[in-house]
Amino acid sequence: MNMAIHKNQNGPDGKLFEGLIKRLAGSLHLYKQYFMIQLKSTMQYKTSFFLTALGQFLASFNVFLGMYFMFQRFRNVRAYGYGEVLLCCGILLMEFSLAETFARGFDQFSSIIGNGTFDRIMVRPRSSVLQVLGQRIEFTRLGRMVQAVIIFAYSLSVGTVDWSFSRIVVLIFMLLGGTALFAGIFLIYAAICFFTLEGLEFMNVLTDGAREYGKYPFDIYGKKILLFATFVVPYACVQYYPLLFVLGRGKWWYGLLPGAGVVFLLPCYLLWRVGVRHYKSTGS
């Protein structure tokens, strides 16, 4: 029996699984190297880093002030109180900040194509996606992340959410799903650059625009916007629906919808693969 088990482990399926594990471990190790290189490069100019991060923090702080003064005059927005809107805002800003920190390479992809860097990426025996991710890690966006954490923490003190284990888990799913969603949008932006060479400004509506109007629950904008944010670009699946679950107003399966943000990566990656196949070298 032991011989049979040993034989099964060395069969085609076992070797395939072992190969996948080794490949994943190799990719993680490579990304770790990229991460450390980018961190060391950033820390060469500590003053610039801290001032830029502080600027990111202060530039985003007007969001909190705007909400504070608005709720001083109006007690509710639709059916949402001050603490509930702050919770929504804090979560979305954390999602966007994480995506912008670690997926910044895709947002700068037009320059990667223009200066011929992608030619070098193509001839290396590693994932092109992983290499582009490692081209730029924007640590200065941590200033915005700190502000988002402060808003989130403050929302806990003024809100009325009855936190439970399931709601904490859904909150974590929201962060993961939202980060994946925004990373997917950056990936779409990069894929379009294969055909246009330059990035298209309208994509900012899906990134920076979503960051702005996603600070409030999507249902306040009307049914059409909610439908778009559910079935086209699933912002609502990582914000509105799971937020209802956390607030105790939604169905249990709303807590599963942040997974749509991860699933959204699949069509984004397929579009990327189409772009890679159509890529023509700059010749530089």
Residue ranges: model-predicted function:
Residues 2-284:
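Hydrophobic transmembrane alpha-helices and immediately adjacent juxtamembrane helices
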